[in-house]
Amino acid sequence: MTNREREILELIKKNPFITQEEIASKLNIARASVAVHITNLMKKGYILGKGYIINLDEYVLVIGGANVDIQGFPKEKLRYKDSNIGILNMSLGGVGRNIAENLARLNVNVKLITAIGDDMYGRKILEHSKNIGIDMSHSLVVSDDNTSTYLSILDEDGDMAVALSCMDICDRIGVDFIKSKKKIIESSKVCVVDTNIPKETLEVIAELEDVVLFLDTVSTKKAQKVKDFIGKFHTIKPNRYEAEVLTGIYVDNVDNAKKACEVLLNKGVQRVFLSLGEDGVVFGDSRGIFKIDMPKVYVVNATGAGDAFLAGLVFSYINDYSMEASAKFAMAAAAIALSSKDTISNKMTIQNVNTKAKEMGLC
C-alpha cells in the first residue's frame, strides 16, 4: 500500500460516506487521482466494493519453511565423535512457521505460505496451525515429497553445536506458484519472507510494488540468495555473520556492525536490526544507527530466539512502535524464547513480553 493510499483509506475508515471530492480537498490532490487510488485499493482488497465497504481483516503474511524439529540436549559436556547421554525433543519448526506461530501467540492475524508433504508430519503442522490460529489455506501440500526435517544438537550451554536440515520441499515454492498468490501478498499489511525458498521466487516477491517486506536471512549460505537485491527489503534482521555476507564487512566489533548497517541502508534497506547475540543489537534507519546492550539471560535453548526476535519486530511495526521500542520489544521476545526448551515458548504473549522487557531493564 502506498502512503497516499494509506491516507485515503484512513479518511474512509473515519467517514465511510466521504465523497471523492472531499477526499481530494483534504489531501489537496485531484479528484481523478482519488478515483485511481480507490480503484487500486479495491484491486488490493482493502475496499470490498462500492459504498466504501472496508476490509478490516488486516493480516501479516509469512512465506517460508515449515518442518519438524528434532533437538538433542546433552546432560553433560558435549563430546564430539562420541555417543552422548541426553534428552531428545521433537517439535514443529521452520523459520517461517516459527515466526508465524510467534505472531499468532502475540494475537496477530497471520497467514502462512509454505510447502509440506501429505504425510504424518505435514498433517500435524496443519492441525497445529489451525489450533493456534495460523491460516495455511494458501500453502502447498504435495503427495510426492516429504515434510522438511531439521535436526540440531545443542551443547551444554544451550547453544547449537551442529545441525542438519532436509528442506528440499521448499524448492516447490516456485515462481509460478508464488505468482498465483500475488493478490494475497500485495494485500498483506506486512509480508515476511525467509531465505529457505528459491532465489528466483525471492526475486519475484522483491519486485512486487507497495509491499512492506521483512526478511529473515536464515543462514550465511542462504543469505547469499538475496545479496544482489537486498535493497528491495523494508526491514532485515541479519546476525553478524549474515551481515558479513551481505556487506563484505567483518563484523567483529560494534563499530564494524554500525558500518555494516550503514552499507545495508545505503543499498536501499529502510530498517536494519543487526543481532550481535549476547552483545546486543545494532539497529538503524535513515535517522541514525544505535546500539542496545543485551541484558544477561539464562539460556536453555537458543534455537528459536531469532524467529521470536523477528516476530517481535513485526508486531512492533504494525503497532507503530519507534525503532528503539521495536528493538527492545523484540529483544524481550527473544529472551522468552531463550529461556524455553521448546523452539516456540508457550509463554509468548504480549503481556509476558512487556513484563520481560521490564525485568530486563529495557523499559
Outline where the language-model segments fall.
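Conserved phosphate-binding/catalytic region of the ribokinase-like
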Residues: 1-20, 26-27, 31-32, 39-55, ...
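Glycine-rich phosphate/adenosyl-contacting loop at the front of the ribokinase-like
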Residues: 3-4, 8-10, 18-22, 26, ...
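Short gly/ser/thr-rich secondary-structure transition/capping motifs
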Residues: 43-45, 171-176, 215-221
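Conserved N-terminal subdomain of the carbohydrate kinase-like
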Residues: 56-57, 75, 80-85, 105-189, ...
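Short, conserved phosphate/pyrophosphate- and ester-handling motifs at nucleotide-, phospho-/glycolipid
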Residues: 103, 239, 306
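Hydrophobic anchor at the start of a short beta-strand
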Residues: 109-110, 136-137, 213, 272, ...
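Conserved beta-alpha-beta core of the PfkB/ribokinase-like small-molecule kinase fold
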Residues: 190-259, 280
